[in-house]
Each structure stands twice: as C-alpha cells, then as structure tokens.
Amino acid sequence: MGLRQDIDKEGAIVIPVFNEEGNIRAIVEEVRRSGIAWDIVAVDDGSTDGSRELLEKLPVTLISHPVNLGYGAAVQTGLRHAVAAGYGTVVLMDADGQHIPSEIPNLLAALEKGADIVIGSRLLGNSSVYRIPFLRRMGIKFFSALAKILGGTKIYDVTSGFQAMRRNVAQFLAEEYPVDFPDAEVIISLGLRKFRIAEIPARFRRREHGISMYSNPIRAFYYPFKTILASFIVLLRIIRGKK
C-alpha cells in the first residue's frame, strides 16, 4: 500500500466506504476535478457489493477491512494512516455523494482562521440542496442541545461527517474515535478537551445510489440511546481524570 509520488503531502481526504459501488467513482473523480491534489485515503469497511474492487482501479490509497467494523472504525483507520503518513490537515467526507468536494476549500479557509476542526453544516444559511427529513432534523437538534450541555460547544449540525481538521485533532481522534454512531459524542469529547470547533454553511445533496445506514430501523432506534450513554461516559472519564 505505497503512497503515490504525485501527491501533495500537505493533507489527505479520508473517505470511509461501505457498499458504495454506485457512488464512489463519481466522488473520487469529482475530488480530482476540483483541483485538490491531496491523497484520497479510501477505507473500505468490508463492502460486499464490489466497492473494494472498484477502488482498486481508482487513484486512491486503499485500505481494506476484512469485515464490516462500522463507520467509526473506518474513520479511525483512515485517520491513523493520515497521521502516520505525516499529513498536517485531514478532510473527512462520506462516500454516498452528499458531500460536495468543491466545498472543501471553504472548510480549509475556516481552518486557517484558527479553528482546530471545522464542521460543514446543512443547517446554517441556505446550505443544503435537499430538505432534511423532519425526524432527522429533530434528532440533530436534540443532539446539538446535548453537545452544548455536556461539551460546552454550540454546533447546529452535530451529525455532519463533512469536516476538516488540523493534525492535533486527527491525532486525538485516531485514538479516541467512537466505533458506532460517533456524531455528537465526537463533538462533546472535543469540546470538553477545549479544541477550537468552528461550523460553516456547506452545500449538501441527496444520495443518488444505495441505502443510508440510518434507514435500518434497529440501528435508528439504538442510535439515540447509545449516543446519550456514550456522551455521559466521556464526561465522567474526563471528570475522573482518566484521559
């Protein structure tokens, strides 16, 4: 798994992938057309639909999990690779096509203003090109309030996976990233540890192919309870000085 020599060593774009055969080629090509010459680190999380075979043919650094370990594990694998490779900046984006690569320069510009991590938000301004379903929007608001109460940081779109971060954040999350449904838990953990978190409007779009993991009713039911419990555990660990 050698790095290609034509890559700008300044940063990496980490894309966790699970069964995104219908979307991933377009995402990689769109990133390249945007003029961003950074390494694209695609972490295939045990896909069963041909995503890995497709990624092997694309201009990416491919890391494969032998089985599906979950979104958080895939992100953590990508961050660990980026840190080990010496990248100073990491962009995290999804493989489902909802995150628009041409928005990345805006995230980086906000990072340069002093933030440690920048969140691309669907809820600021007229940022989305699609309407977020009502229940999902209510869930985002709930976890935003939870992050404010527990982490002391007001972020409107705490479930956004479209982020740019400095190396210090990447190093921390490479070891502390939650395995399942990280969302608010990550924001709370970063807020409690006094990382500087910024949020800017970012355009999103609808998924064109495949099925979101949130469409699974069992996982959707489990999600809020797991996140609340994990968030309190993070708070208790910090209070007790274990981390």
Model-derived features with residue positions:
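Short beta-strand-to-loop acidic/aromatic patch adjacent to the donor-nucleotide binding site
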Residues: 87-98
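Acceptor/aglycone-binding surface of glycosyltransferases and processive sugar-polymer synthases
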Residues: 65-84, 101-180, 207-229
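N-proximal low-complexity "stem/linker" segments adjacent to membrane-targeting elements
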Residues: 1-32
